[in-house]
């Protein structure tokens, strides 16, 4: 390989020469100096050539430090790194799909369970209240109420058997206190809404806790015999039976005061009359005459009366 090098052009040089001439005369001496300058450009060109050898890599034969990549395609490293990154991305995507699907199934199952639990057939509620879809008095209106004192020990087992048989044979089973539906405070439509009523939630939890606390007592309530021979256990039956027996004994005023003042129930004369043998005999005589049908009031009870009825039922249980 030949390399041509061009040298710089030479700069012009300045040459200065000085000559002096002296002439002597009698009058004066004149000295003249003549200067002359001459400059010629000097141009010089030089060429040089050199040979540079090409680089030859060492042979791979017998050299352990050189990777033999003859069988591998170009960009092998990029292909390996991209494959690893793709596998990681696909694993994350698959995990996300599985998690989303399982969460969706769990949410649907919980939603279906809650919709069934909050439906009218599975909602548990205690007693009569203005928050119910229909008042509890409709279930106990025009029915025959029999108190515990009116039922002899021998007839209790038979009445329980009759109640079980009538419950299984009846096409439309009666609704117990644990099966009364709530109103629209907690319904399926509200559960599907984003709005949640704190008051309704608190009321529901409070009533549910009362249900769990009062469930042993409700199982020991007296039997109610309806006109269709359907028997139920209810807190309202205890209240109505005590009211009916007190009405038969001519104690309407005392019972009304006892209902409004639950603290005086234990010492009320109507309670003593109910527990006395004379009152039992009079009640039996009145029932034998056909005065077993008690029609409850059409007026809807207030919340305070509802709570007082609950307290009265507890006192009568004890």
From Swiss-Prot:
Low complexity: compositionally biased ranges: 238-247
GO cellular component terms listed in the entry, alphabetical order: cellular bud neck; fungal-type vacuole; membrane
Membrane topology: Single-pass membrane protein
Start-end of Basic and acidic residues biased regions: 250-261, 309-318
Gene this chain is encoded by: PRM5
Name under which the protein is recorded: Pheromone-regulated membrane protein 5
Localization of this protein: Membrane
Cysteines engaged in disulfide bonds, as pairs: none
Residue(s) carrying Phosphoserine: 129, 279, 282, 288
